Amino acid sequence: MKAFLVGGAVRDRLLGLPVRERDWVVVGESPETMIARGFRPVGRDFPVFLHPETHEEYALARTERKTAPGYRGFVVHAAPDVTLEQDLERRDLTINAMAETPDGRLVDPFGGRRDLEARLLRHVSSAFAEDPVRILRVARFTARLTPLGFRVAPETLVEMRRMVEAGEVDALVPERVWAEFAKALAEPAPSAFFRTLRDCGALKRLFPEIERLFGVPQPPRHHPEIDTGVHTLMVLDQAARLTADPSARFAALTHDLGKALTPPELWPSHRGHERLGLGALNTLCDRFRAPNAFRRLAEKVMRYHGLCHRAAELRTSTLVDLLDRLGALKRHDDTLEPFLLACEADARGRAGFEERPYPQADWLREAQRAAVSVDSRPLIEQRLQGPAFGRALRQLRIAAVRRLRAARSPATPAGRLPHPQGEGE
């Protein structure tokens, strides 16, 4: 059987990166002969099989022909007469159109290795324009490979713009966009995904809520980068530095959507943007059917990031109420940490502030621990119930956090903290 290692495994090995998964292309076989060899068919749209021992995917070499607009209008031809080069030619980028023989010889008919060395993301052929998903894939690869110096080849960017202008991206269903977006969020430089989409004109079609942030000014005293769109992508990259949690990264990306809705005559002030942005956030989440955990965390970060930045200035009662609204006073809560990381990313996502500490997070962590450690048994012994129990427990928590604050020196978060940004100014 002629089986060739293809795609990402070859690319990543040449880049010196860990190989995440190994995919194979088989030449000269049919579904019947593959099944006879013990392979299990799993492909729905084209012949893909699982190896009986390694369970790696083996696909029959195939060609594709476009028959309708969008990304679903394809006729697939998989047969023993399809060559390896024909299979590689249908792929998106030259760096993904390489194969390796069983004895380790590189098969590179489209210059993938050359483009790896030049750090270029270049499309293989004119067939690239037949599938709008490839715009998203190129953007996702920039999110992965920008830290290694990769950029989109000029001719590929031109082709992507033509596809957008022709309305190809309008045929993408939200679930497909979300699938690529979610993968991009997990990459080392997720902001590059959005920059690439903006460069080719696809951002305003697919993520208008993000596109509208560009050109909206913020107070230069707190935001030297000024532009809200620039700030948003800086925050996203800071979130990627701080956490691998995709929900926290999503919350960081969407926290300032309300600033795009501030009337221009009020610029650069954005008072009330936390409330203004909730509708845009829900529209985005509804459109892409975002997971509920993403939506809930993003809503909390949007509503309360300003209060988090002012944590040391808040009255103790307000601080306890904030923790309660965040759901952080439940003993097994796991949402406070991603909330704090998203807020820290916001504070650091400003020109010149990237390495600033964010002691507000530690103060809120300590306050939360003090509040949840309160012993409620005396209230139970008093037979308090319902709202009366809740009010009494709140007072105990306020007293516990007040004691914590009093025990700290003025130089700590119980005293004064540097105000990270004037969100309402």
Swiss-Prot record:
Q: Cross-referenced PROSITE patterns, in alphabetical order? A: HD
- Tell me which residues make up the HD domain: 228-329
Q: How is the cofactor bound?
A: Magnesium is required for nucleotidyltransferase activity.
How is this protein named in the record?
Multifunctional CCA protein
Residue sites binding ATP per the record: G8, R11, R91, R137, R140
Name of the gene encoding the protein in the UniProt record: cca
Required cofactor names: Mg(2+); Ni(2+)
Which superkingdom, per the lineage?
Bacteria
